[in-house]
Amino acid sequence: VNGMLPSIPAAGNHEYGSDENGTRHLSTHWHPQFTLPMHGPKGLEETAYYVDYQGVRIVVLNTNEQLEKQVAWLDGVLADNPQHWTVLTFHHPIFSAAAGRDNADLRALWMPIIDRYEVDLVLQGHDHTYGRTRNVRSGLSVRDDDSGTVYVVSVSGPKMYESGVHPLMRRVAEDTQLYQIIEVDGDELVY
């Protein structure tokens, strides 16, 4: 399938395993499965990368390892972005609809860059619920739809968690398998 349909995968916790010393490593199945750009930070090639597609820069980050190493790289990728729209995707969520599952470390590292470059949409997974925030800037909801970033957590598999109440979430769902359609038409990105 991956040889026939374009994919932009983000490595999750299940793509990693531990060796006999307890050190986590990316699965040996990852690289043969996908042919991905090699321009990510050293040591994260094919797990942190970006793709420009029809006016959209899609940036994939790796939330499993070397988080700090990706800060300067992400800053550079977004500073040199000629595309009209910017979408980030990664596995572990900054904001989650599942109770107690927000990721403060990711928020502290990456959110200032997301805000600085006015990223439009952040797609995340891991928490087996659905949640879509209002437009967010600096960790707070903004009132207009033309500024801030929308953060989405979604699930397509059968395992589900309970959703919680989160003040930034505009929509929440649990026990629901989903997929998303994103349409870009010039000056309009519809999610």
What are these regions (language model features)?
Residues 117-119, 148-149:
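Glycine-enriched alpha-helix->loop->beta-strand junction motifs that scaffold or abut catalytic
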